[in-house]
Amino acid sequence: MTNMAEDKTSISKVHSEFSNSSNTTGSEEESRSHQESFDGESSSGESKSKSKLNLEYSADIEPLKFRMTKTNNTNDKLKYSNNGNATDSFMRLKEHLQRGNTLNSNLRVNEFYPFNSIDTEQFENYLREPKYIKMLKRRKNLKQFRRLFLAQELMAYEGETVTSTSKSSEPTSKAIWSTKFSRDGKFMATGSKDGKIRIWKVIGSPVERAELDSSAESNKEARAKSMRIKQQVSSLNNPKEKQFLDSATEKYEEKEKLLNLYAPVFHPTPLRLYKEHVQDVLDINWSKNNFILSASMDKTVKLWHPDRKNSLKTFIHPDFVTCVEFHPTDDRFFISGCLDHKCRLWSILDDEVSFEYDCQDLITSVTLSPEEGKYTIIGTFNGYVHILMTRGLTPVSSFHVADRQTQEQNAHVMVTETDSKIRHGPRVTGLQAFRSQLDNSFRLVVTSNDSRIRIFDLEQRKLLEVLKGFHSGSSQHKAQLSIWHGQPIVVNSSDDHWVYGWRLKSSDRENDQDEPKRKPKGLARSGSLRSIFSKSMSRSSSQNNEEKPHHHLKLTNLLPLPHHSNDHYIKNTDYISFHAHNAPVTCVSIAPPETSKTLSLSNDVICELSLEFFQTSDSFDVLSRSNDDGIMSDVESSLGYNSKPGSISNASATSAIPDVVDAIGTILISTDNVGTIRVFRADMPSVIRKRVLLKLEEYNREVRRRFNSSDSLHSLSRSFNSRAKSNLAGQPAAAYTNTGKGYATGRGYSNICPKSSTSLKTLGSNAQPRTPRESMSSIFSNAHGPTTPTSAMNLPIRCNVCNGSRFEAFSGANDQQDRNYYCVDCGTVVNNFR
């Protein structure tokens, strides 16, 4: 085979070889996708054109933000930030980090810092009519794609306006080619066409979230101040321009006035920015110890670590390095794939190649078998898949993704050595190996540039399923498989600006039950295949059954020839998709469970509300319902319960405790070829949202009742002019209890009816209302406690934290004037200065 890499004279020439090489194996869909524009008809044969779909399912969306009420606490934060006093900083963090204290054995108070100043009217309107991403569904719905909204948009190129047009799909220098999460879920790395690598950090603590909000607020203040300075300078020269700038400044300040993201995932600026690569970064991989490998078109692989500002090592290759992957159990070794046809096993400590294998084709993708990394799988430019033993890189088997005859040859035959016919395309652009949860078989996800995703059983050398719907175009799309409550979900990017998702039918138990009806066709082929299939055919059959030559004689007379025995694969077009970008989407990733666990430690709004308003009866109700479109199906999707027989869920039928991963919900990351990174999240289930809304409505009625009552004016005015500085007074914090299956809150909202005396239970402890238009903090900090004779609304002194009215003096205080009191319900100290 001629080495195509030797003929290239420039980077653009090789890029054109990758993007313009056609598939000659008879794939009509690929040629259509290359010829038609994004404004033409979609390959799925829908009646609407893609341009009409793009208008109906618009990608012109903004991250969900809420208007922030600038309270005294906000002013104090800015004052503390300006003073820089250590005591003030301590007090500021203390206010943010007081997670709660115990009221009694059944009640708990929590402070949610993101709620401290969210405008209740805007939040209430959102809860009534949330605006989610509009989905295009084909027959079935994926639970992981329900209630998606744009949570965050990361600007990799700060200070530059990202523009895109649907008429041109040419990638810019800002195009992002690779996106990978670290194994601990705390970081995400992106590699760009301009050779830059960015490390993004997941918000992992309340301190980080508090600093994030303060930083965003300071930046908005700085931008507004800059505009005012420009306005003053220009007014000296041109009075008319001053009037125009005054109007522009007012509009800007009104638009940008303290808007905070509803549920961010990452810090807005990269933790690290590496610029050592001089050409495109094509692939990125993380090790178990958070080391990073990057493969580039500058013919190098570089080793990084987020704790270091520069690369640790550089590994030189003779040609473009298209793919790289760490050994899953020993990160002293890694595999690289190069355009010189060679796959190399490198020793990082020795800084040398330990083994190499020449596959006689351009290597475009590589992966290792899960868990132990025993096998190395290579994908090539012309559509071949090579399976090697990782130790020594010795060949085991190979086949062509589009040629079933090569797939059914002897398992130990390398088709490139025995085939006189050289097949061209489709190009393999992505590989991912996984273990089936049905039979623990070794399976492979193959993405190719003929707009197909193929699922292979490598042990049986059998094509199981083909996923259709996305448009490959010229990008190196890599489908990602994620196991979500026992169900394999595949997501992929597309050149038509959309994101696609499928549920694997080949992994369904109902489809697996039909397999024995199709497997006799393979049994009639030969004794060797009979032994391969015997385990999945019948566990009770003995070895003597293999020697019966006429066992399936009648069936084989009705079947096609042996080389067509692989015809019965599943054609899966039941995808769900949404218009994610205004430019070709290059990467799509679902955040791993470790990311959700990290995010749950930062007082995430969705997680906190889902756990707080989750009721014990939810789990049993959900498990007893069928998978319909009712209210409980939303809880089913968010909290991980599945009513189908044989389904696997993180929450057992006897457990009433949701897992934090289920409470966080789906986190989906997508990138495009103009440098935009969008973070989509699943909102809280509808039943949780309705309970929160009921809580807000109940609170508003209570506020109106208070303002109409003259007896409570003194207590209201006192709460408006005071600021809570809670002292837990030795009371233990009511954090989540780790039960092994999830995190349980100290109580559930079983009584949310307004008639209940304990229905207004507080969720916050640290903010006070300042106007009749309340902030979110006042909802969860000024709710009343149990209605007893000593807690009537007409008492002049009430606790700023729990709104209780029972106080006792500290023992040992003799002076009546200097005596300090504390709230019996929550332990908050009340002294003369308050």
Curated annotation (Swiss-Prot):
Modified residues (Phosphoserine): 528
GO terms, biological process: sterol transport
Biased composition, class Basic and acidic residues, residue ranges: 1-16, 213-224
Positions with biased composition (Low complexity): 17-26
One Pfam short name: WD40
Bilayer-spanning residue ranges: none
Sequence positions bearing Phosphothreonine: 771
WD repeats: 171-210, 276-314, 316-356, 358-398, 423-468
Keyword Phosphoprotein included in the entry's annotation: yes
Region Disordered: start-end pairs: 1-51, 213-233, 761-789
Keywords annotated in UniProt: Phosphoprotein, Repeat, WD repeat
Lineage: superkingdom: Eukaryota
InterPro entries: G-protein_beta_WD-40_rep, WD40/YVTN_repeat-like_dom_sf, WD40_repeat_dom_sf, WD40_rpt, WDR44/Dgr2
Keyword Repeat: yes
Family the entry assigns: Belongs to the WD repeat DGR2 family.
Comment field (misc): Present with 538 molecules/cell in log phase SD medium.
Protein name: WD repeat-containing protein YMR102C
Native species: Saccharomyces cerevisiae (strain ATCC 204508 / S288c)
